[in-house]
């Protein structure tokens, strides 16, 4: 099964450069502790790498019961 990434915003992007704020928004994260599930692809991995100090990432199996 393809992998998915569970991404959680754990630190506010306030005070960080605009490009990092924009990356957080493009990942679909709007609020603290919000979780989104994204496909594991190079583009998403690159976005995560850019804001790795603001998010927590966990790999999950597609179709799993994790929320």
Swiss-Prot record:
GO terms for biological process: translation. The keyword Ribosomal protein applies. The keyword Ribosomal protein applies. Part of the 50S ribosomal subunit. This is Large ribosomal subunit protein uL30. GO terms for cellular component: cytosolic large ribosomal subunit. It comes from Thermotoga neapolitana (strain ATCC 49049 / DSM 4359 / NBRC 107923 / NS-E). Pfam families: Ribosomal_L30. GO terms for molecular function: structural constituent of ribosome. Coiled coil: none annotated. PANTHER family: LARGE RIBOSOMAL SUBUNIT PROTEIN UL30M, MITOCHONDRIAL RIBOSOMAL PROTEIN L30. NCBIfam families: rpmD_bact.
